[in-house]
Amino acid sequence: MNMDIFDNDLSIPVNLIRQWCFCPRIVYYQELLAIKPNKPLWVAQGEEFHKKVEQLEKRRSFSRYGLENAIRHFNLSIKSQKYKLHGIVDWVIETDTNVYVVEYKTNPNPNSLGHKLQIAAYALLVQEYFAKPCKTTFLTSDKKSYEIKITDELINKLIKTISDILSTLDSGNKPDSSASDHQCIQCEYYNFCNDR
């Protein structure tokens, strides 16, 4: 997706937030230079994992999440002009009074800032879409779930990150990278960084 940075309705895909946390240059290469590398093997594995988990979740109760009566919404596409975000939420659990985001990961890391900010972004989207609070989310694999609370501190970090991404897209300047050598080796844009 190439973004028109002069578009007043510009919104960024939520998955860019996690990418930005991994390395801001990914956003630069992907969105401003429109470089589309081949998908690494783990991306295809993740897509298969999502399909498998969705089929399993359709048959499960809500007890894993401490809920009883609820409605499931899978792969919900949402856009918010207010937050300048859009994305496809893996799964939303809707009760009479609240909504809960469930984000699938093959290797969920509840301590990863990228994972936390991504799920917080989805929480903002579903909260606006359903007009119900979303203060609790779940980062889950096929075996384990981690509860992530949506705090004011997390939302403030998210808003700053969105602002930083939009500023980079607006300026067109290649951002600095704080990625470690270990992160760089995993990156599909590694060959494009001439200072790494």
From Swiss-Prot:
Its cofactor is Mg(2+); [4Fe-4S] cluster. It catalyses: exonucleolytic cleavage in the 5'- to 3'-direction to yield nucleoside 3'-phosphates. Mg(2+) or Mn(2+) required for ssDNA cleavage activity. Keywords: Antiviral defense, Exonuclease, Hydrolase, Iron, Iron-sulfur, Manganese, Metal-binding, Nuclease. InterPro entries: Cas4_exonuclease, CRISPR-assoc_prot_Cas4, Dna2/Cas4_DUF83, PDDEXK-like_dom_sf, Restrct_endonuc-II-like. GO terms for molecular function: exonuclease activity; iron-sulfur cluster binding; metal ion binding. The keyword Metal-binding applies. Disruption phenotype: No effect on expression of bacterial lipoprotein FTN_1103. Bacteria are as virulent in mice as wild-type bacteria. GO terms for biological process: defense response to virus. Its EC number is 3.1.12.1. Gene3D superfamilies: 3.90.320.10. [4Fe-4S] cluster binds at residues 23, 184, 187, 193. Pfam families: Cas_Cas4. It is an enzyme of class 3 (hydrolase). Induction: In culture expression is high during early log phase (1 hour), decreases and then rises again in late stationary phase (16 hours). During infection of mouse bone marrow-derived macrophages (BMDM) expression is maximal after 2 hours, when the bacteria is expected to be in the phagosome. PANTHER family: CRISPR-ASSOCIATED EXONUCLEASE CAS4, DNA REPLICATION ATP-DEPENDENT HELICASE_NUCLEASE DNA2. Part of a type II CRISPR-Cas system. Belongs to the CRISPR-associated exonuclease Cas4 family. This is CRISPR-associated exonuclease Cas4. It comes from Francisella tularensis subsp. novicida (strain U112). The lineage of its organism: Bacteria, Pseudomonadati, Pseudomonadota, Gammaproteobacteria, Thiotrichales.
